[in-house]
Amino acid sequence: MQSIEDIWQETLQIVKKNMSKPSYDTWMKSTTAHSLEGNTFIISAPNNFVRDWLEKSYTQFIANILQEITGRLFDVRFIDGEQEENFEYTVIKPNPALDEDGIEIGKHMLNPRYVFDTFVIGSGNRFAHAASLAVAEAPAKAYNPLFIYGGVGLGKTHLMHAVGHYVQQHKDNAKVMYLSSEKFTNEFISSIRDNKTEEFRTKYRNVDVLLIDDIQFLAGKEGTQEEFFHTFNTLYDEQKQIIISSDRPPKEIPTLEDRLRSRFEWGLITDITPPDLETRIAILRKKAKADGLDIPNEVMLYIANQIDSNIRELEGALIRVVAYSSLVNKDITAGLAAEALKDIIPSSKSQVITISGIQEAVGEYFHVRLEDFKAKKRTKSIAFPRQIAMYLSRELTDASLPKIGDEFGGRDHTTVIHAHEKISQLLKTDQVLKNDLAEIEKNLRKAQNMF
C-alpha cells in the first residue's frame, strides 16, 4: 500500500529521467504531494510562479505518469503556499487512512516544509520564533493563547505549522488541528444547516493544540464569534494550547466582541515585521541551499535589495530568476536577475540607491571586501573607504544616522557624523578625492540604470 508521498517520489524519479537537470531543479524538485481529494491528486508548489508554470506545462505529463504508476486516471491540481493556507489541516495520525485502492487519503496534513529548522530567524521575527518554540516545548504552560500578527507572507503560518509538527513529534497521540477562521465559519454554518452542531463542537473541542489562521475574518460574524468563544473557553479550561494568527493586533480588529478580544490578550501577543536586508539574504541563501541552487552572492544581494515586502515574494523572485536562467540558457548574474524581475519590480524601485549598493561600489573601486565595511578593522586601506561609503550613504540615501551605523557593523551614529564631516572637509581641498567620489557615484548610477 503506497502513501501519496511514496507515489509522488516515484513520480519524481520518472520525471527526473525525462527532464534536464536545470529544468528539474527549477520546476519539480521543491514540489510535494499535498493531498488526495476524491480523484484529484493535489501537488504543492513553493510559489504561484512555479504553480502557474507547472499547471500550464506539466499537468498532462504528470497525470500520465500517475496513471502509469497506480493504474488510476487522476485529475492533477497544483497549489502554492498561499493556497495551502486556506486548506483545513486536520489531526495527523501515525497510521493514516487508506482508500479502497490502498492510497493514503491525505486529509490536509501540516505542511512538511513548515518546521522550525527551515525558519530563518531575524530581528523582525526573533521574539515570535522564541515564543512559538516555548509553546511547542510546553503546550498550554508557556503562553496561552499565543497571538501572532503581521503582514502577509512573513512567516506566521510557518510558525504555527512548526509548533504543530514539534508537538506531534514529541508528544504521543497529540491531536493537532490547523484551519483558517474562514474554514471554521463555513463548517459552523454547514453544521447548523445539517443539524450537526454537536459533531462540529466535538471535532474542535477535542484537540490538544488548535491552530487558527487569519482570525480577523471572524469580525462581524456574530454567530461564529459566539461559537468560537465557547470553543476557546472549553480548550482553555482543559489546558489545551491555542495559537491564533492575524494581520493586526486584537485591539485593531473591527467589530470583534470585547469578550473575545480580552481572551486573545490573556496570553502573549507578538508581531512579525518584514525582514531586514541581512535576514532577506539569509532567507535566499537557505532557500538556494535547500533547493541545491548555486546562486552568486551579488545576485542574492540584488534580489534582497529589490524585494523587501515579504518572504513569499522574496523566494518567488529567486525561483523566477533561476527559471529565467534555465529558459534562456544563460548564467545567473545580477544583470540576468534584473531582466528576469523587470516585470515585478517598479522602475522607480530599481533606481533607488541603497547603502549596500554604495558599499559594493566603493568596495569595488578601492578593492575592499564587503564584509570589511562591517568589521572592526581600522587600517587606513579599509577605514578610509569605509568613511567614504558612510559619507555617500548620508548624501545619496534617505537613511537615518542610526540606520547607516547599523549597516556598517552596528557602529554608533556619531561615527557616521565624524566620517561625513571628515570627507566633507577633505573635498574642499583634495581634487583627487573629488575625482574618486565622482567616479564612484558615476559607477553607482550606471549600475542602478542597468537594473
From Swiss-Prot:
GO MF entries: ATP binding; ATP hydrolysis activity; DNA replication origin binding; lipid binding
Keyword line: ATP-binding, Cytoplasm, DNA replication, DNA-binding, Lipid-binding, Nucleotide-binding
Domain of life: Bacteria
Subcellular location: Cytoplasm
InterPro entries: AAA+_ATPase, Chromosome_initiator_DnaA, Chromosome_initiator_DnaA-like, Chromosome_initiator_DnaA_CS, DnaA_C, DnaA_dom, DnaA_N_dom, DnaA_N_sf
Pfam family, one: DnaA_N
Region feature (Domain III, AAA+ region): 109-325
Residues given in the record as ATP binding sites: G153, G155, K156, T157
Residue ranges of the region described as Domain IV, binds dsDNA: 326-451
Keyword Membrane set for record: no
Similarity section: Belongs to the DnaA family.
PANTHER family: CHROMOSOMAL REPLICATION INITIATOR PROTEIN DNAA (PTHR30050:SF2)
Domain comment (free text): Domain I is involved in oligomerization and binding regulators, domain II is flexibile and of varying length in different bacteria, domain III forms the AAA+ region, while domain IV binds dsDNA.
Name of the protein in question: Chromosomal replication initiator protein DnaA
